[in-house]
Amino acid sequence: MLYPLIRQFLFQLDPEKAHELTIQQLKRIAGTPLEYLVRQSVPTKAVTCMGIAFKNPLGLAAGLDKNGECIDALGAMGFGFIEVGTVTPHAQIGNEKPRLFRLTKAYGLINRMGFNNKGVDNLVNNIQKSHFGGVLGINIGKNKDTPIEQGKDDYLICMEKVYPYANYIAVNISSPNTPQLTTLQSGEILDDLLRAIKDKQAKLQEYHHKYVPIAVKITPDMTESELIQMADLLVQHKIDGIIATNTTTSRELVHGLDHSSQSGGLSGRPLQLMSTEVIRILSSKLQGKLPIIGVGGIDSLISAREKMAAGATLIQIYSSFIFHGPRLIKDIISDL
C-alpha cells in the first residue's frame, strides 16, 4: 500500500493538522471509486463478545473518528468493529493547542485533546448518513464545564441519543485530559454512575426493543487494589464489558525523549506492557464474569497475541494505526 509515502508526508505536518487532513480525505473518498485505495480483504475470524457477533476481534479504538465522519472508509479497511467518539452532549473545542505530540522514536503519542468534538447530535447525524454494516461502538463522555457531581447526567443524555445506533456503548471515565473525570472511577460516585447507567439502559431497552451492551473504559494508572475494587463494582452492576486501557500519565518509559515532558495521556508502544498487566490482573480477578477489550500499544501480531493471552476477548488499535497504516490490520488478523 502507499501508506509509507503518505506517512512521510503527514509526519512533516503538525500532528493535529495531519489528523484533520486524514479525516477530510477519508471522508472524501468514501463511496467513490477511490475507496479502493484503503479497501482490503481480511480473513474472517469470528468471535462473540457481549452478545455481539464480530467478524474478527480487531477494532479501531475511540479518538480517531470522534465525530463519526469517516466510518465508511474506516470500515473498508477490515476492522472487526469501529468505536467512534468520545462524544459529549454539547460541542466543545477541547484544550488549547498544541495538544497532540508524536514520540516518533518510541512509536508513541501524547495527547491532551480534552474531548474536542462537535456534539452528540452531530455524531448521530453522521451515523445516519453512513452505510457501515459492521459493529459500531459509540464512546461517550462528559462536557468539561459540567460539574463532576452532575457528570452522570451527561452520560445519560448521550446514552439516550446514541442508543438506537450503537451496537455497544463505551463509557469513558478515564481520560486524563478532562478535569476530575478520573474521580468517577471509584467509590460512591462510581457506584452512583453505574446504577444510573444500568437504569437508563433498562428503560432504553424497553423503549427500543433491543439490548445495547455497556462497556466501561478504564485508566492504567490504578493500583492493583483499586482495579480489583472497580472490577467488583462492574460485576455487581452487571456492566457488560471493560475496555482496558485508556492512556497513561506515566512517563517512565519515554523519559528524555522529545515531547516526553508534555502533559496529557501517553499511548502507543510505551503503554503496551502496562495495559497488558492491567488486563492480566482483571482477567485473574474476573474469571470470565466480564469480557475484556484490550487496548494499548498493540502494534504487531505478537503484541496482539499477548493481549489475548492476558485475557482480552477483543482488541483495539489507534496509535499504531497512525504509525503503520491499514496494512497493520491485515497483518494482525491474518495470523491471529
Swiss-Prot record:
Its cofactor is FMN. It is an enzyme of class 1 (oxidoreductase). Belongs to the dihydroorotate dehydrogenase family. Type 2 subfamily. InterPro entries: Aldolase_TIM, DHO_dehydrogenase, Dihydroorotate_DH_1_2, Dihydroorotate_DH_2, Dihydroorotate_DH_cat, Dihydroorotate_DH_CS. It comes from Baumannia cicadellinicola subsp. Homalodisca coagulata. Substrate binds at K66, N111, R112, M113, G114, F115, N172, N177, N246, T247. Keywords: Cell membrane, Flavoprotein, FMN, Membrane, Oxidoreductase, Pyrimidine biosynthesis. GO terms for cellular component: cytoplasm; plasma membrane. Its EC number is 1.3.5.2. Monomer. This is Dihydroorotate dehydrogenase (quinone). The gene is pyrD.
